[in-house]
Amino acid sequence: MTLSEEISQLHTNKVPSIPRLGVQEYYYWSEGQHGIYAMFGNLQNGGQPSNADIGVYGDTHSTCFPVNLAMAMSWDPELIYREAKAISDEARGFVDKSLFGKSQNNLGELKTNYGYLTYWAPTINLNRDPRWGRSDETFGEDAYLTSLMAAAYVNGYQGQTMDGKSETGYLKIAATAKHFALNNIENNRQGISSNINDEALRDYYTSQFKYIIEQAHVAGLMTSYNAVNGTPAVANTYLVNQLAQRTYGFDGYITSDCGAIRTTYDNFPLGHAWAAPGWTSDRKGYSAVWTNNETGKTISAAAGGQAYAIRAGTCLNCGGGESTVKNIEDAIKIGILSKGVIDRALTTVFTVRMKTGEFDPPEDVVYTKIKKDVIQSKKHQLLAEEAAENTLVLLKNDAVDGTIKKLLPIDASKIHKIVIVGDLAKKVTLGGYSGEPDFTVNAVQGISEKLKAVNPNIAVDFEDTHSATTSTIPAVLSEKTKENIKSADLVIVFVGTDEQVSHEDYDRASIAMPGNLNSMIYQVAALGNHNMVLAIQAIGTVQINFIKDFFPAIVYSSYNGQSQGAALANVLLGKKNPSGHLNFTWYLDDTQLPDMSNYYLTPKQTGGLGRTYMHFLGKSSFPFGYGLSYSQFKISQLKILTKDVTPDDSVKVSFDVTNTGTLPGETVSQLYVAPPEIKGKQMPVKKLQGFQKTKNLQPGETQHVNLSVSVADLAFWNQKELKSVVYDGVYRFQIGYNANEIADSSEVNIQGKLTPKVTHVTLCPEDLVYQVGETINLQSKNKWIKSSINPGLEEQHSVADNVVEAVNNDGSFVDLANAQIKYRSADILVATVSDLGVVKTVGKGITTITATVNGVSGGTVFIVK
């Protein structure tokens, strides 16, 4: 490719074809968090978006599953894996060329075109504050739970086994994990800085990214709008290159968030008015100019921001106008970018596209056999309902008025009248980036249909009570509804949140029950019928500490997909015994929450009670991991055979879970580890280190559970030593029903040092394309990955700017001057490499040069012309 052609391939929207090279027109930006939401390339293929027809543009819509926050409350990685497989099936189904006589997802003029397969999902930022407007996209507040759930999602999405191995040799579709990193505020998100120390950055905010890079081999990453400690994430060399690529071993493509290159140079609130080290910005917003502090040379800040983003590793510009030939040529001319950096970016992008089978004969790619019939198939419809049933959390279930029998489940044969109140009960709130299904079931529909299927004579009355999440006037109950409530066998009060309260670009100001919903609750409660269920469907925590005593039973879900009403009905009726467990702490009220801009977690650093179950010292409405069942379970027989271990060992934990109730059911047993107190550090109270969802246990049945904890996973980043350390001391292993309710515990003494072992080796030379006769020294530095962090803005980091870097399991970089490195060329007719890492190009062609450090290898392509 020419430089102009290369540049044209490094943005995401309507990337032009190059017919002479067999490259089709392409569109990277597709959305599919919990159902195919949008394939923006359809705009170029006859589709016309409208407010009435969002989602997949055209007449064919897709199955919508529960949002990630809901799915993770199943605590069932296998269920999420099946959901993701179904979503990616539908993504491939939209590439069926028979759809509307041509592929709905087919771009360009080449006969070989069969669409694009890169999707901006999943969101794996941690839900550290319930007010965040995108909480529904997350897998919860815990990094460990998120890691396992997100890995299952990526594996299912990309056509891999549950342990991350490719099933066919091809990517089914390419997942793009977002947003890297510390993207947890919507208000002014393009202009704010998320400030944090390395301990929290590594141990909490990016640990789930590390896991899915290493274990699920996610194909793509998306950087975030925010800055991190003053340096825009999109151009942050430490964050993107050193952490994601060279420490965690990420080798896929990295895209900016859409329009995020602009945040490098524009003024607040649209950007950070940033300039790279050695440069000064005139801070004139969209027209800003950088001036070199030594030479006085100038360059447009748009060109500078684009150059430093690519240098950091953000190879794709999503939706921005900065990736132009002029900007790139200006950056190269002034010396802040090189053709070699462009080549490397292009290589990572096309490598992922090749893995989807785009450049292979379609008959060789098994996924091309997936047809349009999978879209909204009966199988997927049933899976959406199954998923929704498994995410519902039973928060409370008491007996009424001194009776013995608990209110739930409902015995439909003994019910004559049910009243449902609340406008949300007749709405289907799907959440951010939802599929647009043709089939949906709201709560009123689901409850009516399921009840009348058992007892056709049941009367189901509904009134919205003029309730709304945005209303500022009291709810109104009609006299008829009041009388119906007084005489009803059961009253269901449906409350929660919707997109009017919280969404992308808009955080909640408060976790208080929104609008006039509390007004409705108080009026219903005053009528004296105690047979009441509070059904909450919300983006996360809503304040209920003043109202929960009104209700013997409370059921919660987040936005629960297209079959949310059917799933709720099945749980209320007992057709499905609830087994969901909270993946966040249900705080009492706003006074327990620090300022959203404070990214720290500990009580001392947040100036309050701390964030998440790991550090929170207050009393919550419900703890992390909480969830009831219509049955009861007992954990017993905890056994840990080895009580003295080193950081190189694993701790084997076993116990029994017995259904002591009268109904079949499932539960989630949870393993927490409480670390010792360490002088000078605020350690977490405990951390989740294992869990097991049981099978459906019959009354009296016992399941034996075995869990294993790698002691190395108990390490914490030590800023002084610039590595992760497992501290000596006594650790308490706790097995329980939730973070607060521990059934049993046992102490394990951990002593010694973690033995450093190389985990990743990376090669990043300044160029990839060479002429015959050149000599390249691999034992040198790459000037293009020099830090983009302005001195004084951050604490000291280790530096990883060598061409060859090797990282250990403790996050430290190997001192290569004292290491044994073995080099190899895959084709010595193209290039040779000496024992000292000197490469000599000897013939035209392509070869891979690898470096092996302590038995672990990494490599890069060398192209010789």
Tell what function each PLM region has.
Residues 704, 722-724, 838-840:
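Short, surface-exposed beta-strand/beta-hairpin micro-motifs centered on an aromatic residue
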